[in-house]
Amino acid sequence: MGKITLRNVQKRFGEAVVIPSLDLDIEDGEFVVFVGPSGCGKSTLLRLIAGLEDVSDGQIMIDGRDATEMPPAKRGLAMVFQSYALYPHMTVKKNIAFPLRMAKMEPQEIERRVSNAAKILNLTNYLDRRPGQLSGGQRQRVAIGRAIVREPAAFLFDEPLSNLDAALRVNMRLEITELHQSLETTMIYVTHDQVEAMTMADKIVVLNAGRIEQVGSPLTLYRNPANLFVAGFIGSPKMNLIEGPEAAKHGATTIGIRPEHIDLSREAGAWEGEVGVSEHLGSDTFLHVHVAGMPTLTVRTGGEFGVHHGDRVWLTPQADKIHRFGADGKAL
């Protein structure tokens, strides 16, 4: 079991209020991602759940037990940090087994758990190597293996892919997702990368200044952002946000339209503009178009659409894809 409940959780460092008041339910077996900009409180929230930071007020429940004052070792959670934190003088096998040896577990049970974790993570052939002989991705798998052998109620990941290059990050995203599908254990994952959040999560928690802006599935947040912050944060490239007379036509203070929901033409359309920068990615091209009275608009089109700097184009937003926001920033 790995159900985690937070009720009116607050965190203060002296006079600084990092998390004002927060309520959240994480169901057993869910893959939940905390995402937000730097300083939004996502890592602090994870550390509160882990017990590495004390709660200033409120309650944390793990599987129906009040864990607010419970020491980290008693919570039944396993954490994987951004840095691998492996012992360089120990073999992979000894690194994975370390928490079990510290718990004075029977040698036969340690062997069983280490062997099982190594199979899951494709580390069986590397058990006798030391961390210095491994790639970055393999080292991160060893760190995950050290968490798996504890057979926790939930896994806590604190930006575990930040130290890896782009190709390894893609591979590890897939491996962690497959691991979740295999173990069916609750996972809470912290990242500032909304691509990781969108591709891995069952449920995303968008945080801003210690407050939850929105909770939902990746597609729910993408299709129905609750406010301007979520609209501008979720999606890459980010949503185009337009104020002024064009927004007023739609009865809103601000309207939003995603780059792929703007139709592009060389002949006619709602808005005439001039192509500034073109980003050619092969399958897609992102055009940054200057339209009078608006911010520069980003348009996503096919990779074969040939336009150049200075070309005149016409843009038409798809009417059913326009998002409307009021003066308070909330979706209408």
UniProtKB/Swiss-Prot annotation:
Keyword match ATP-binding: yes
Gene3D superfamilies attached to this UniProt entry: 2.40.50.100, Nucleic acid-binding proteins (2.40.50.140), P-loop containing nucleotide triphosphate hydrolases (3.40.50.300)
PROSITE patterns attached to this UniProt entry: ABC_TRANSPORTER_1, ABC_TRANSPORTER_2
One GO molecular-function entry: ATP binding
Domain of life: Bacteria
Keywords of the record: ATP-binding, Nucleotide-binding, Transport
Domain ABC transporter, residue spans: 4-234
Annotated binding of ATP, by residue: G36, P37, S38, G39, C40, G41, K42, S43
A GO CC annotation given for this chain: maltose transport complex
InterPro entries: AAA+_ATPase, ABC_transporter-like_ATP-bd, ABC_transporter-like_CS, ABC_transpr_MalK-like, ABC_transpr_MalK/UgpC-like, Mo/tungstate-bd_C_term_dom, NA-bd_OB-fold, P-loop_NTPase
Family statement: Belongs to the ABC transporter superfamily.
Descriptive protein name: ATP-binding transport protein SmoK
Species assigned in the record: Cereibacter sphaeroides (Rhodobacter sphaeroides)
